[in-house]
């Protein structure tokens, strides 16, 4: 059986692996209900280290308000990260979004039926225990507004269900 060759991008993705929890500020419906929320991530490298598998949940006022399952890989021809996004809204996930590293941030732009969304995952902070997420939304793909900003620390995964 032939296996894919791991690239330097895979090692960068592996830095994001772990369990995280933290506070989020939600500004726009694309990020959930406006206000303060708690976000939890569980991320791990799967399938021989070829993919970063992300499970995310958002909680507000004691209820789960958002669930996401995402898979980040590497495009074989370009070497760019790819994002496959699935959430509890049941929207057609469409084609994977292509991303780029901007410093320590992994940034994706994806189109949805509601417009464009830009996600920026911040690589763990210098102490290796932190993760950041910024989500911006745009109706026209030109003018962007903050939707969500979160700061997370390594934590036990305490997944609730709804």
Task: Report each predicted region and the residues it spans.
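Hydrophobic small-molecule pocket/channel-lining residues, especially in calycin-type beta-barrels
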Residues: 1-162
């Amino acid at each position: 059986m032939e296996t894919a060759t791991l690239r330097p991008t895979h090692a960068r993705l592996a830095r994001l692996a772990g369990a995280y929890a933290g506070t989020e500020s939600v500004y726009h419906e694309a990020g959930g209900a406006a206000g303060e929320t708690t976000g939890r991530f569980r991320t791990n490298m799967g399938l021989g280290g070829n993919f970063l598998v992300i499970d995310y949940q958002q909680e507000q006022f004691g209820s789960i308000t958002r669930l996401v399952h995402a898979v980040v890989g590497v495009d074989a021809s370009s070497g760019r990260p790819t994002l496959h996004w699935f959430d509890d809204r049941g929207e057609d996930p469409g084609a994977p979004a292509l991303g780029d590293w901007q410093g320590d941030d992994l940034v994706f732009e994806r189109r949805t039926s509601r417009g464009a969304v830009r996600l920026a995952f911040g690589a763990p902070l210098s102490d290796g225990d932190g993760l950041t997420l910024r989500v911006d939304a745009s109706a026209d793909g030109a003018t962007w507004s903050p939707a969500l900003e979160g700061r997370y620390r390594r934590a036990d995964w305490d997944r609730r269900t709804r």
